[in-house]
Curated annotation (Swiss-Prot):
Gene Ontology process terms (BP): riboflavin biosynthetic process
Stated name of the protein: 6,7-dimethyl-8-ribityllumazine synthase
Pfam families: DMRL_synthase
GO cellular component, one term: cytosol
GO molecular function term, any single one: 6,7-dimethyl-8-ribityllumazine synthase activity
Family designation: Belongs to the DMRL synthase family.
Residues reported in the UniProt entry to bind (2S)-2-hydroxy-3-oxobutyl phosphate: A84, T85, R125
Binding site for 5-amino-6-(D-ribitylamino)uracil: F21, A55, F56, E57, C79, V80, I81, F111
Role played: Catalyzes the formation of 6,7-dimethyl-8-ribityllumazine by condensation of 5-amino-6-(D-ribitylamino)uracil with 3,4-dihydroxy-2-butanone 4-phosphate. This is the penultimate step in the biosynthesis of riboflavin.
EC number(s) on file: 2.5.1.78
């Protein structure tokens, strides 16, 4: 048997956790996510936005929200651009691990953190050549929220 979730957001409650660091990118990712959620039937009143200082703080809030079981999915959005030090590697790795761990609470937690080598690459992923990764994360959230509900009924 194959199971595939529908891509309709009607009736879903979604949390979006966004890093303020590199806000010129993360603002666009958030706009892309909200636009995509609304286009797929999630009403504005069912979308809650939580702002955190940076990508490193995303897992903490995502975990708290996932544990509450108030949301059908949690989307994490951030942007980490490589600099001249190893800080990039630590932030990317720990954010990814923490976000993945947040999904262990039974609520889908979506990784929408853009990690790039340059500002130009980040801009491309926030709505130009490479699409909007916030919108892509929203699609994943809708699909995973619906798939999670399907699995609960098995």
């Amino acid at each position: 048997m194959n199971y595939s979730a529908k891509l309709t957001g009607e009736g879903l409650k979604i949390a979006v956790v966004t890093s303020r660091f590199n806000h010129f990118i993360t603002d666009r990712l958030t706009e892309g996510a909200i636009d995509t959620l609304e286009r797929h039937g999630v009403v504005k009143e069912d979308i809650d936005i939580f702002l955190v200082p940076g990508a490193f703080e995303l897992p903490f809030v995502a975990s708290k929200l996932a544990q509450k079981k108030k949301y059908d999915a949690v989307i994490t959005l951030g942007c980490v651009i490589r600099g001249a030090t190893t800080h990039y590697d630590y932030v990317c790795n720990e954010a990814a691990k923490g976000i993945a761990k947040a999904g262990e609470y039974g609520t889908p937690v979506i990784f929408g953190v853009v990690t790039t080598e340059s500002i130009e690459q980040a801009i491309e992923r926030a709505g130009t050549k490479a699409g909007n990764k916030g919108g892509e994360a929203a699609i994943s959230a809708i699909e995973m929220a619906n798939l999670n509900k399907m699995m609960d009924e098995l």
